[in-house]
């Protein structure tokens, strides 16, 4: 595989002396100040893209040197990504901005197998990384003529309200006996290697949130992009790519009645999505970001197992924290409900309680970044029972020939498979080529690295359409029964 470009940033670390400081993410009472210095590995005179496909940062945390590897999140935007706002006279204004050369990255810490990172490099470095089991945040200090950044732990952010923040979901979709029985099965590690799924996401911002950010559409847009980048990172272990399809800002007034009763707001938003938003642009799921204070301690709500249903593939999320990472965890949680996941509680004689997992009923401190085994079981059960069709197909994207980057969710020039993790049994992470003896790495007609037999049903009949069956020569599931 062609050697990717590496950029090294040297960070000098200075301990802060004094009390707290007010950052964009809130008041922080303990942090380190770092000054990035960029050193490029490109030959002198070479043309640099604004944002490289791959970067490497070296810095110290608590006196220990770390190496942060970053790769651009090329699956962040759909090819038809749009942004919509409204003029003072109520006219809908939609644009299709160029987002190919964006500045949002995912990554990991060298020699830390459990590490993750989600970083924006748009204006300095902003985001989070997980190091040795602890979550750190980084953001620019916004000092005049300075490259200073702050690195700090989530627990060092001063909390205005210590009361637990709750998800408003209470229903259980596992109703009939066959589903109950299936829900008690535990997945093997092999079964937890989920096939790739894709969710084209629409984000709608209500008028209260527009006012909250001083009517600054650009600030809201950046916040939404950072949020989806974080959500995308948290869904990687489930092999789900969250792609932002559209962003709509209700910049004049709300198009539904947003009210403190979260259940009513959710129902109204679902009906609006079904009758209005789906007619504007294709997408799989819509999330309403609002600044309203819901009744009780509710900060989010979504229909369980609603994915791909016109009025139920929705969620409502309160933008209650200045820290975008926290709100991203809430959105990840509500999307989990749409994908069939219930709260991590003791249920059906299963021990599912996990206070530090994404699907816990209350947001943890620090916010969770991992799904429990029970959540993975719920998701697999949802796929089996509902067979949601809308998340099978990869979103349209611009086909560019670029340096192959493993694990970016898409096949690129020179890749036979998107390898991602070195533990992938079918795909060599070093070369992005199939391992010896492997015919495939993923797909509806791929099973344990081999093509499924000819005429194996890979997609059940829908309406007048017949069953789709494997050809025996490809990992893809052909449409309309064309199996040869």
Swiss-Prot record:
Belongs to the venom metalloproteinase (M12B) family. P-II subfamily. P-IIa sub-subfamily. It comes from Protobothrops mucrosquamatus. GO terms for biological process: proteolysis. Its main location: secreted. This is Zinc metalloproteinase/disintegrin PMMP-2. The active site is at residue 334. InterPro entries: Disintegrin_CS (IPR018358), Disintegrin_dom (IPR001762), Disintegrin_dom_sf (IPR036436), MetalloPept_cat_dom_sf (IPR024079), Peptidase_M12B (IPR001590), Peptidase_M12B_N (IPR002870), Reprolysin_adamalysin (IPR034027). Residues 197-395 form the Peptidase M12B domain. The keyword Hydrolase applies. GO terms for molecular function: metal ion binding; metalloendopeptidase activity; toxin activity.
């Amino acid at each position: 595989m062609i050697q990717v470009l590496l950029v090294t940033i040297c960070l000098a670390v200075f301990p802060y002396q004094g009390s707290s400081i007010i950052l964009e993410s809130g008041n922080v009472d303990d942090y380190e100040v770092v000054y990035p210095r960029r050193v490029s590995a490109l030959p002198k005179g070479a043309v640099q893209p604004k944002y490289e496909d791959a970067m490497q940062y070296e810095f110290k945390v608590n006196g220990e040197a770390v190496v942060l590897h970053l790769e651009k999140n090329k699956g962040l935007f759909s090819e038809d990504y749009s942004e919509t706002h409204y003029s003072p006279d109520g006219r809908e204004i939609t644009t299709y901005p160029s987002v190919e050369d964006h500045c949002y990255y995912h990554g990991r810490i060298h020699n830390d197998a459990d590490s993750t990172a989600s970083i924006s490099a748009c204006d300095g470095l902003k985001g989070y990384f997980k190091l040795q089991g602890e979550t750190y945040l980084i953001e620019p200090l916004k000092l005049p003529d300075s490259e200073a950044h702050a690195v700090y732990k989530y627990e060092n952010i001063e909390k205005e309200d210590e009361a637990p923040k709750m998800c408003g979901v209470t229903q259980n979709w596992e109703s009939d006996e066959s589903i109950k029985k299936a829900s008690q099965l535990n997945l093997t590690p092999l079964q937890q290697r989920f096939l790739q799924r894709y969710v084209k996401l629409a984000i709608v911002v209500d008028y209260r949130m527009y006012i909250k950010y001083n009517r600054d559409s650009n600030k809201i847009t950046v916040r939404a992009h950072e949020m989806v980048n974080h959500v995308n990172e948290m869904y990687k272990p489930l092999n789900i790519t969250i792609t932002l399809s559209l962003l709509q800002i209700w910049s004049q007034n709300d198009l539904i009645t947003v009210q403190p009763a979260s259940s009513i707001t959710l129902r109204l938003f679902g009906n609006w999505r079904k009758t209005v938003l789906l007619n504007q642009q294709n997408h799989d799921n819509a999330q309403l970001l609002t600044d309203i204070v819901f009744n009780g301690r509710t900060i989010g709500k979504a229909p369980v197992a609603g994915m791909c249903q016109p009025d139920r593939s929705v969620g409502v999320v309160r933008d209650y924290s200045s820290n975008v990472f926290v709100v991203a965890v809430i959105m990840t949680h509500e999307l989990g409900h749409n994908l069939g996941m219930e709260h991590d509680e003791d249920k059906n004689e299963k021990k599912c309680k996990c206070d530090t997992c994404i699907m816990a009923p209350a947001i943890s401190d620090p916010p969770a970044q991992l799904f429990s085994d029970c959540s993975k079981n719920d998701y697999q059960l949802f796929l089996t029972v509902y067979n949601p069709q809308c998340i099978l197909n990869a979103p349209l994207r611009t086909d560019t020939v670029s340096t192959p980057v493993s694990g970016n969710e898409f096949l690129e020039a020179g890749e036979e498979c998107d390898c991602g993790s070195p533990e992938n049994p079918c795909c060599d992470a070093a070369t992005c080529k199939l391992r010896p003896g492997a015919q495939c790495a993923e797909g509806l007609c791929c099973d344990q690295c081999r093509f499924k037999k000819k005429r194996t049903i890979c997609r059940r009949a829908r309406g007048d359409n017949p069953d789709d069956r494997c050809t025996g020569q490809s990992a893809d599931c052909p449409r309309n029964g064309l199996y040869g």
